[in-house]
Amino acid sequence: GWYAREFDAVGVEFKRRGRIFERNLDLMLRLWTEDSVTLQVDNHNLRQAVLLPKPYQSPHPPVLIGGYVDAVLRRAARMGDGWLTYFYTPEGFTKSWDKVLAYAEEYGRDPSTLSSTNQLAIYVGPSKEEVDPDMRHWLSTEWDVAGWSDSTIEHAICGTPDQCVEQLQAHIETGVDRLVLIPYRYQPEQVELIAREVLPRLTA
């Protein structure tokens, strides 16, 4: 989490968020993979705690760690199965993903075992010029980005099907493993357009 007011609302000290996350992730991984867990850490006191049913995936579901700053990129490389971000341009994504891979090597992990995910807003319409103002208004009023990160509304995929395909191909060429598309205002007709006019034309 990067939004300090969310932590203030629940009485959690913002600067402790990284430590709390790592503690809770370690606990979750143990509950997923061990028959029972006994430990005492901070305000947690578990005695032969059992979590059933165990996850279908073995040893556990993929853990994608999201965030922007180097501390989070290091955490993803050290503790996660991959990195998750949103609203990154191809250039911004590449810069941070290269860091994750380098950190993985630093921690003695095989970088090829990690995956990457970028979430992108998309609006398919008559032309980029026509839909861009509406997309910008939506992203600037109903979404939020960390001003000190590479997350930006400039990432937005919008325009004709041809234009959207061209913009998405630039992301695919970064080597990103997974793109999550967020249709403009979650409109069902946008989902249909993306599925029919855009996705079939993308090439890895």
Enumerate the predicted regions with their spans.
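Active-site-adjacent structural elements that line small-molecule/cofactor binding pockets in enzymes
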Residues: 1-204
